[in-house]
Amino acid sequence: MSRLFVTCYGCWVRYVVLSCFLMFALGKGVAQQRSMRVMEYNVENMFDTLHTAGLSDIDFTPTGSYQWNSQRYWAKLGRLSRVIAAAGGAQPIDLLALVEIENDSVVNDLIHHTKLWRMGYECVVSHSADVRGINVALVYLPYRFRLLSKDSLRVAPQGKTLRPTRDILHVAGELVTGDTLDVYVCHFPSRRGGKQSQNFRESVAQHLRHYVDSVMCMRSQPNVLIMGDFNGYWPESFLTEGLGVQLAATSEAVQPNELYLLTYALKGGADVRGTYKFQGEWNQLDHFVVNGTMLDDNRKGHPYIKSSSCRLFSPMFLLKKERSGEGVRPYRTFLGNYYQGGYSDHLPILLDLYF
């Protein structure tokens, strides 16, 4: 037997073994991907370092009150990429809603110029009339969520005293099951301002419900996911009346086109009881809301949610001990004007969709 034949035969055997291994690994990977992980994260004033004419963003420049320079900017992007990677674990985050980002360039720097670049993420960003330039974004894996349409939905101020607010981002995409998922990313008006801000949140909630109802009438099998910083918690009236949300855990007869809150009374480790801490009290300001169709766990082959699907993400590296030594709080970037060098004043929330 010639040496050439032996060499070729050995190469052929290695090729067959390698091919079989890759086919097995691919098949196993496909079998394991019968779910997708969704994350929502308010990232606390993720601005670039440049002043944009017409926007009140001068504080977040190198000479502004926060001394927001390139070193701090890139350090924060690196920290955020660590959070996103850790939240995905063995299964990367498929859909990521980012709240409190300034513009497209910030999100593109995050997904293309940090450790996340390997994932191949793409993004859609709102373009709001907010005076500070605050926007929201949806980051997605294009092979898991094929973009169908996108729209930055304007919420017109009601009355002369109300200023423009953040747009609602609506993104429709096709899942690996062939189903269409309509995603709404929102950032409701701040709680500052008392009764006036409450009225504004009511107005945004009513606009959002109108947009969602229109889509649910248009789709034959609607799958709706609303997520973001609502700046409010159950059972405030803008949720129960303006948006018409019910609690998923207490709804005996779930209706396909009604909306259900998944993020009531979430608990994390280290006695964490919400996504935001104010004056020593935890508040659940960040939420996931879905339509009733997605609560049907008999929909094998289509997106559905289990009772354990939704949770806080609160690893210790995202937390900092209170000055009193009792309890913890989110490890934020700034405390007032003091630079702490942390991650965000909010904690992320996670949701697993199953097929």
Annotated model-derived regions:
Residues 62-71, 92-98, 125-126, 157-158, ...:
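Second-shell loop/turn segments in exported
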Residues 44, 102, 189, 230-233:
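Catalytic metal-binding/acid-base residues of hydrolase active sites
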Residues 1-33:
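Bacterial Sec-dependent N-terminal signal peptides
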Residues 105-108, 132-135, 192-196, 233-238, ...:
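Extracytoplasmic/secreted cell-surface and envelope-processing proteins
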Residues 101-180, 184-189:
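Structured beta-strand-rich core segments of catalytic domains in phosphoester-bond hydrolases
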Residues 210, 214-224, 232-355:
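Metal-dependent phosphoester-hydrolase catalytic domains
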Residues 30-114, 124-136, 322-328, 352-355:
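N-terminal, active-site-proximal structural segment of metallo-dependent hydrolase catalytic domains
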Residues 54, 176-210, 236:
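Metal-dependent phosphoester/phosphodiester hydrolase catalytic core
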